[in-house]
């Protein structure tokens, strides 16, 4: 083996050793740093930003009436066809929705319904926890959409998810603990 080949081999060895040392330094640095995983839902909860597109909600006007004029533009523009609006006219001739349902199991949360609404009656809020065991529970009606909270002015952080009062704590009964949890799920 010539001297040039020996130098090249030594150089390659030191280069790989330097790369290995850099990788190990980075690995040990992350190993001893604080974790970045959020302990959801036990100890931490994420607050979405105000521009986050979560659950739908319907707005009311100054008199407390629903803002929706049942023009059905939101239902027509929806790419998932998950909005159903049935209009009716009251005695004054104003249009209102007799039925307004959104199937959130099919919804993409794209916000096109919010953009298409001429009365600014429908909007997407910040709630992201609305899972269910039944897909029928994910169909939200007009009264439920009116009762949902709107957008918060602040957001984009992590807050403690610990309960402040003991009255909200749910205690599992003896038969709900352990391996029998799946027997208590209602099947529809």
Swiss-Prot record:
Q: What is this protein called?
A: NADH-quinone oxidoreductase subunit I 2
Protein origin, superkingdom: Bacteria
Q: Which cofactor does it need?
A: [4Fe-4S] cluster
Which Enzyme Commission numbers does its entry carry?
Answer: 7.1.1.-
Its placement in the membrane is given as: Peripheral membrane protein
Q: How is the cofactor bound?
A: Binds 2 [4Fe-4S] clusters per subunit.
The UniProt keywords, alphabetically, are: 4Fe-4S, Cell inner membrane, Cell membrane, Iron, Iron-sulfur, Membrane, Metal-binding, NAD, Quinone, Repeat, Translocase, Ubiquinone
Cross-referenced HAMAP family:
NDH1_NuoI
Q: Where does [4Fe-4S] cluster 1 bind?
A: 68, 71, 74, 117
* A GO molecular function held by the record: quinone binding
Per its UniProt record, what SUPFAM superfamilies does this chain match? 4Fe-4S ferredoxins
Q: Which reaction does it catalyse?
A: a quinone + NADH + 5 H(+)(in) = a quinol + NAD(+) + 4 H(+)(out)
Q: In UniProt terms, what function does this protein have?
A: NDH-1 shuttles electrons from NADH, via FMN and iron-sulfur (Fe-S) centers, to quinones in the respiratory chain. The immediate electron acceptor for the enzyme in this species is believed to be ubiquinone. Couples the redox reaction to proton translocation (for every two electrons transferred, four hydrogen ions are translocated across the cytoplasmic membrane), and thus conserves the redox energy in a proton gradient.
| Gene (name only) | nuoI2
Q: Which residues form the 4Fe-4S ferredoxin-type domain?
A: 56-88, 98-127
One Pfam family name from the record? Fer4_7
Q: What family does the database annotate?
A: Belongs to the complex I 23 kDa subunit family.
């Amino acid at each position: 083996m010539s001297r040039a080949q020996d130098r090249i081999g030594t150089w390659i060895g030191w280069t790989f050793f330097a790369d290995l040392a850099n990788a190990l330094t980075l690995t040990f640095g992350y190993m001893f740093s604080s974790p970045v995983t959020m302990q959801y839902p036990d100890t931490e909860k994420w607050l979405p930003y105000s521009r986050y597109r979560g659950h739908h909600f319907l707005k009311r006007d100054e008199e407390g009436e629903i803002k929706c004029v049942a023009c059905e533009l939101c239902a027509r523009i929806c790419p998932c066809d998950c909005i159903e609006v049935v209009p009716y006219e009251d005695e004054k001739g104003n249009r209102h929705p007799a039925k307004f349902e959104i199937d959130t199991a099919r919804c993409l949360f794209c916000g096109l319904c919010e953009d298409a609404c001429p009365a600014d009656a429908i909007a997407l809020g910040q709630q992201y926890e609305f899972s269910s065991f039944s897909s029928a529970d994910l169909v939200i009606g007009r009264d439920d959409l009116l009762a949902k909270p709107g957008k918060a002015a602040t957001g984009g952080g992590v807050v403690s998810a610990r309960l402040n009062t003991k009255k909200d704590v749910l205690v599992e009964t003896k038969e709900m603990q352990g391996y029998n949890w799946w027997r208590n799920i209602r099947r529809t």
